[in-house]
């Protein structure tokens, strides 16, 4: 029997594509009779929905705030430690871990954003403008955003360099990006494994009243997901929304995670959306707009394509590798390019279904 200490921290606090990956690995491991699973979580982070109750019924769990990773490993005689999103472990003590370790680094988007000065394009508070001033005039300063972000990886980089630690990632793009910024890891054989498909069940019953009304009305809509995350780049769509609505007055824009005011009447803003409702949104959309600045893999386009829903996506990072010629591409920096691709899709819709 192999004892595995499984990372539950990557499933806490918020939903993400990386978290979906980790949950799928967990579900598959539960089916293995030759593996005994223990879980590590952080009591200072929230579990999503009823995850804590579900996990505690299935495995024995340890709080990293009460016991160091190394101590959990020794007490439970762990053979393999699995960390599903290695960046989530930056705050913790990673010393004295001698068992086999499997780590996944999905991307280094925060480094890519700052090293390429994309963070200058984000919306900022007055406080953040002070930081941007430092970035603009003295980017080599230890206080610059570039150097502060890189410094946050210090603990992780040291840990990944150990002989007992194996590193996995989710695309060839992510592998090359990791090696570009962390050249010392070239001695590692980074394994690339594309993420498994999601296994959510789509129910015909809709939980959200707004979504119910949307479907009942039969309105056509563009779908944009996770607008609350800066790297998803809702701003580029927001800039051309008026032109989209003006040219296509019967087209609506459905946005999940929207935390800003949009005055265009054809925008439907949604907060939390259940997994089943999200599947229905993907299935019934006229098209998905995926404008990310950075992606290690990118689940949403795959989710849309499985329902034969066209995708208009940014042409950077992993997108061309993962999506090939199945989608329409645009530059995430040009609102006019996005608008042009929406017009093009409208003219040639049958070719992208």
Label each PLM-derived region with a short phrase.
Residues 1-353:
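Carbohydrate transferase catalytic cores enriched for Leloir-type hexosyltransferases
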């Amino acid at each position: 029997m192999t004892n595995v200490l499984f990372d539950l921290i990557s499933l806490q606090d918020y939903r993400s594509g990386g978290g979906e990956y980790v949950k799928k690995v967990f579900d598959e491991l539960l089916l293995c009779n030759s593996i005994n699973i223990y879980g590590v979580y952080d009591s200072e982070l929230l579990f999503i929905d009823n995850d804590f109750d579900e996990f505690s019924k299935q495995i024995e769990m340890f709080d990293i705030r009460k016991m160091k990773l190394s101590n959990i490993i020794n007490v439970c005689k762990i053979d393999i430690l699995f960390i599903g999103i290695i960046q989530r472990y930056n705050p913790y003590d990673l010393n004295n871990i001698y068992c086999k370790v499997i780590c996944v680094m999905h991307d280094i988007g925060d480094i890519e954003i700052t090293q390429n000065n994309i963070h200058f394009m984000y919306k900022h508070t007055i406080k953040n403008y002070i930081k941007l001033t430092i970035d603009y005039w003295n980017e080599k300063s230890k206080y610059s955003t570039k150097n502060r972000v890189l410094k946050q990886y210090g603990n992780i980089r040291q840990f990944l360099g150990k002989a007992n630690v194996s590193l996995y990632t989710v695309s060839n793009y992510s592998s090359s990006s990791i090696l570009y910024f962390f050249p010392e890891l070239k001695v590692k054989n980074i394994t690339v494994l594309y993420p498994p498909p999601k296994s959510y069940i789509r129910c015909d019953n809709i939980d959200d009243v707004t979504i119910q009304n949307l479907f009942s009305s039969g309105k056509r809509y563009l779908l944009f997901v996770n607008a609350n995350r800066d790297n998803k780049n809702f701003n580029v769509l927001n800039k051309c929304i008026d032109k989209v609505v003006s040219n296509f007055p019967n087209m609506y824009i459905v946005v999940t995670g929207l935390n800003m005011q949009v005055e265009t009447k054809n925008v439907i803003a949604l907060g939390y959306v259940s997994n089943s409702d999200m599947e229905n949104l993907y299935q019934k959309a006229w098209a998905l707009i995926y404008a990310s600045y950075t992606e290690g893999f990118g689940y949403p386009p795959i989710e849309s394509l499985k329902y034969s829903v066209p995708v208009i996506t940014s042409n950077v990072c992993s997108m061309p590798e993962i999506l090939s010629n199945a989608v329409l591409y645009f530059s995430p920096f040009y609102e006019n390019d996005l608008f042009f691709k929406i017009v093009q899709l409208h003219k040639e819709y049958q070719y992208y279904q």
